[in-house]
Amino acid sequence: MDQNPQSQLKLLVTHGKEQGYLTYSEVNDHLPEDIIDSEQIDDIIQMINDMGIPVVEEAPDADDLILNEINTDTDEDAVEAATQVLSSVESELGRTTDPVRMYMREMGTVELLTREGEIDIAKRIEEGINQVQCSVSEYPEAITYLLEQYDRVKTGQIRLSDIITGFVDPNAEEIFPPTAIHIGSELLDEQQNNEEDEENNQEDHEDDHSIDPELANEKFSELRIQYNNTNNTIKNKNRTHKDSLLEIYNLSEVFKQFRLVPKQFDHLVNNMRHMMERVRKQERIIIKLCVEICKMPKKNFIKIFPIKKINYLWFIREQNTNQPWSENLKKVKEDVFISVKKLIKIEEETGLTIEQVKDINKRMSIGEAKARRAKKEMVEANLRLVISIAKKYTNRGLQFLDLIQEGNIGLMKAVDKFEYRRGYKFSTYATWWIRQAITRSIADQARTIRIPVHMIETINKLNRISRQMLQEIGREPTPEELSEKMLIPEDKIRKVLKIAKEPISMETPIGDDDDSHLGDFIEDTTLELPLDSATSESLRSATHDVLSGLTAREAKVLRMRFGIDMNTDHTLEEVGKQFDVTRERIRQIEAKALRKLRHPSRSEVLRSFLDD
């Protein structure tokens, strides 16, 4: 039937209510083709029976039918019950174990975004990242690290694009028109960075074209000045002073204008997170010693433990009290003091109190969660775009689900790099990244023998030029001609041509009968050829016959000297020891035996085995 399962079931129920019954054959005729499980069929029949529509083997008598019709008509809730049961049947029919169908069904529950919705989510992502950057800016080591990295840029040790991808003007509103150049340049940078991983000896490339060096110098100078002002204010006054708080706010406003490279951003965040882990580790040790070992009530510990400024006084006061746990505290005093000392060291390293470290980490975590939720919304709303692009790349060596996964990776990168102020829609921007991720994965994974992506690009370029030259000169170009055309050394052209060959299966059939395969015609170089085996056997037999014409002593000397029927040959001294004679005597016996073998009657037999 052309109708969908829901329509077929509705038609079946309607038909049953009209005639007052259903036969098993009618149910079977109206069931969808994908319902073949006996349990599912029994469930559907039971549901129909529960609706007041009997399912019988044969059509009932007229009297029984009238009674059934009366019962059905008097049931006012029949229609509502039918709807509920039908919805449960539909949910049963909708279930599937196919991962692609399950993925697409879940994907279809998310609504598409409008242009305004995209901008709203992008702003929430930016707010979350800004909150993280503002939190990190209060960590002095983060600003110091960033300024040190810029000093390395000035000395030529690293590129500016290794630190930042640009700057954000919070007052700007979509001042750039939609353009493909910006997207292409970002993709090129991404591709070049990946190729550097594949081949470390490639020349460095300049990819700072999207960042104005003068603007960067101005922004970093502003950051350095504000950082110094903030430090001086904190040193001269307290960190909690209103002037210090104002300077910290100004520093965060300057710092959040920097669009950091994800690697650098993660480095700063991880440093702060690592610092927090060190704090928690020492606090857990102190809690374990005081609460678990010394049996101090946790409520008491929370009350006496210093939050704003770590010191030893709280412990000293507590161990001098008359509490039941005071004596136990004296036993763990040394271990507690070690952990407290480490916490004080963290305060000295960061220039922050433990309370401030926790507060910064809390605000940073909230910002990360906010950005993560917004990114998740943006990704889920654009999964259909990945499907539509992935469909165009099927049958190229990767399964459809793999293409979707690779496209989703590209989509997530697009979400990370999307700039709503530039004016283009997210789908326009994301298409480039999704396509690049899919094509790169095909180039990287589709071949049985993996070839680096940059080499595949060279192969494609060579094939394109080769086809072009074939049309121009009417024959396949030689490696020398390709080298001259592509401005690549000839040895590299030959290497590329060798790599470009596709592997052939050993089971490839040969001929029309399919009774022989390619592997049958490939020489096995590890085995001895029948001709060589026969020649060796004949030579061995002829050698034995010739040696049998010598004396036993002469034959044994020659066998040992030349390693005939032995694992190895022997020196004159080794043979002499065997016969208990001198080396000179063995040499004389050998010379005499060889003279006998050179006689034409004996040498003629062996001469035929010599290669021409």
From Swiss-Prot:
It is found in: Cytoplasm. Keywords: Cytoplasm, DNA-binding, Sigma factor, Transcription, Transcription regulation. Residues 572-591 bind DNA. One of its GO terms (molecular function) is DNA binding. Residues 378-448 are annotated as: Sigma-70 factor domain-2. The gene is rpoD. This is RNA polymerase sigma factor RpoD. A motif (Interaction with polymerase core subunit RpoC) lies at residues 402-405. One of its GO terms (biological process) is DNA-templated transcription initiation. Residues 191-210 are annotated as: Disordered. Interacts transiently with the RNA polymerase catalytic core. Belongs to the sigma-70 factor family. RpoD/SigA subfamily. InterPro entries: RNA_pol_sigma-70_dom (IPR014284), RNA_pol_sigma70 (IPR000943), RNA_pol_sigma70_r1_2 (IPR009042), RNA_pol_sigma70_r2 (IPR007627), RNA_pol_sigma70_r3 (IPR007624), RNA_pol_sigma70_r4 (IPR007630), RNA_pol_sigma_70_non-ess (IPR007631), RNA_pol_sigma_70_r1_1 (IPR007127). Sigma factors are initiation factors that promote the attachment of RNA polymerase to specific initiation sites and are then released. This sigma factor is the primary sigma factor during exponential growth. Its main location: cytoplasm. Signal peptide: none annotated. It holds the Pfam family Sigma70_r4. The keyword 4Fe-4S does not apply. It comes from Buchnera aphidicola subsp. Acyrthosiphon pisum (strain APS) (Acyrthosiphon pisum symbiotic bacterium).
